[in-house]
Amino acid sequence: MVLTEVLFVVVAALVALYTWFQRNHSYWQRKGIPYIPPTPIIGNTKVVFKMENSFGMHLSEIYNDPRLKDEAVVGIYSMNKPGLIIRDIELIKSILIKDFNRFHNRYARCDPHGDPLGYNNLFFVRDAHWKGIRTKLTPVFTSGKVKQMYTLMQEIGKDLELALQRRGEKNSGSFITEIKEICAQFSTDSIATIAFGIRANSLENPNAEFRNYGRKMFTFTVARAKDFFVAFFLPKLVSLMRIQFFTADFSHFMRSTIGHVMEERERSGLLRNDLIDVLVSLRKEAAAEPSKPHYAKNQDFLVAQAGVFFTAGFETSSSTMSFALYEMAKHPEMQKRLRDEINEALVEGGGSLSYEKIQSLEYLAMVVDEVLRMYPVLPFLDREYESVEGQPDLSLKPFYDYTLENGTPVFIPIYALHHDPKYWTNPSQFDPERFSPANRKNIVAMAYQPFGSGPHNCIGSRIGLLQSKLGLVSLLKNHSVRNCEATMKDMKFDPKGFVLQADGGIHLEIVNDRLYDQSAPSLQ
């Protein structure tokens, strides 16, 4: 009798749960929005859940479904939560710029207790806290401040040249390597010095602390993939499931390192116009008014900004550099043109480039911009709709007779936009000429946004671009790159990654041909 009652309760609970999911999964059909039929319980995240495809590339596949080519939006289900993929350019502009006050938060979240550095950093922080810290950090990233950082970056550029030279000498002038790792060592050292005033020495020691923790951060193991999956698709469960964007050991490392640097900076009174100066200033500002609430009274809030600056700063630049070198190896004629432009400028500058000079290199800029089109590091943007008190909710008219509901997640498929033949001729072809001065005017603004758009765009885009350019200049100064047996013929992306990463890495041969060293004396 008891067993029968237990079975009845279990069956009833399962039926109720199934009915609830089915009810949720009929939402878009009931609202008259075109949608992709969901899988029971897990919605439209089956391939992501099984780690068969990354979410960014899955969004791209949905975007490119021929049945949906004329639709402005597509309804999907993030597990049981109804969400929207935005296809129309004007709607994207509305979300990111015009109606930003309704979409100022990301849908993804972190656990405020188990992962305070994840919860409090500029990427994830919400509402008024986001606006406050964004305003305080913006002065670090002005063109004037970035120009001041360039001299420090150049020192790391020289370290990269020497590291390549040492490896070449050990291998008769050429060697095969996974190029992303070298690029990550460079960008790690660069970010550490320009943001924190620390010599990370990753180029000298690939297992140095900063590089070791950075490598772990973006190595998408099953456990890391699970953390990102829950943070982006089940954000309400991050606390229950103890999800960590920043792992416990990384958080400990950042607290110890940044805390020490801040204390030393306060003790010495040294000013470097870097991120640490801003964090020290915020802490002093909070201490000056002890009776008033201030987010900087929370040390983790300050360390969180350093943590996200470091991780985002090295990953974006190293990815851009490695994808650029992959394309240069595939297109030797483009590589020659780029190296000739770099070499001519280096000869003119006596072996180095001023800030103004590197920014003036036209073909270098074209190559980097095209790399960011084909390989946007963050292949999608996520936002959460928020109703505004006293105002009607946002309508999707004239496209659909539907009004957004509070808490609805929306996804902007950046990779898909960057590869849409509606906006790009032969989008799968690597063609820097798209970004020539003559052709740049033809680009549809919202169809190209490697750093996002509007108030929530990437605050460090200037640094990221400059760092990528300097890294390429330093590497190509006396070295060429070419394909080897391990080089992928066609790029495949890691299906576990939430940022765009080559599956298995990018293996290239680096050849020390001493282009600059041989040409400089004869042209002086």
UniProtKB/Swiss-Prot annotation:
<dbReference type="GO" id="GO:0046683">
    <property type="term" value="P:response to organophosphorus"/>
</dbReference>
<dbReference type="GO" id="GO:0046689">
    <property type="term" value="P:response to mercury ion"/>
</dbReference>
<keyword id="KW-0503">Monooxygenase</keyword>
<keyword id="KW-0472">Membrane</keyword>
<feature type="binding site" description="axial binding residue">
    <location>
        <position position="458"/>
    </location>
    <ligand>
        <name>heme</name>
    </ligand>
</feature>
<dbReference type="GO" id="GO:0005506">
    <property type="term" value="F:iron ion binding"/>
</dbReference>
<dbReference type="GO" id="GO:0016705">
    <property type="term" value="F:oxidoreductase activity, acting on paired donors, with incorporation or reduction of molecular oxygen"/>
</dbReference>
<dbReference type="Pfam" id="PF00067">
    <property type="entry name" value="p450"/>
</dbReference>
<dbReference type="InterPro" id="IPR017972">
    <property type="entry name" value="Cyt_P450_CS"/>
</dbReference>
<dbReference type="GO" id="GO:0004497">
    <property type="term" value="F:monooxygenase activity"/>
</dbReference>
<comment type="similarity">
    <text>Belongs to the cytochrome P450 family.</text>
</comment>
<dbReference type="GO" id="GO:0005789">
    <property type="term" value="C:endoplasmic reticulum membrane"/>
</dbReference>
<dbReference type="InterPro" id="IPR001128">
    <property type="entry name" value="Cyt_P450"/>
</dbReference>
<comment type="function">
    <text>Necessary and sufficient for resistance to insecticides DDT and imidacloprid. May be involved in the metabolism of insect hormones.</text>
</comment>
<keyword id="KW-0560">Oxidoreductase</keyword>
<dbReference type="GO" id="GO:0020037">
    <property type="term" value="F:heme binding"/>
</dbReference>
<keyword id="KW-0256">Endoplasmic reticulum</keyword>
<keyword id="KW-0349">Heme</keyword>
<dbReference type="GO" id="GO:0017085">
    <property type="term" value="P:response to insecticide"/>
</dbReference>
<keyword id="KW-0492">Microsome</keyword>
<dbReference type="GO" id="GO:0046680">
    <property type="term" value="P:response to DDT"/>
</dbReference>
<keyword id="KW-0408">Iron</keyword>
<dbReference type="InterPro" id="IPR050476">
    <property type="entry name" value="Insect_CytP450_Detox"/>
</dbReference>
<dbReference type="GO" id="GO:0046701">
    <property type="term" value="P:insecticide catabolic process"/>
</dbReference>
<protein>
    <recommendedName>
        <fullName>Cytochrome P450 6g1</fullName>
        <ecNumber>1.14.-.-</ecNumber>
    </recommendedName>
</protein>
<keyword id="KW-0479">Metal-binding</keyword>
<dbReference type="InterPro" id="IPR002401">
    <property type="entry name" value="Cyt_P450_E_grp-I"/>
</dbReference>
<dbReference type="InterPro" id="IPR036396">
    <property type="entry name" value="Cyt_P450_sf"/>
</dbReference>
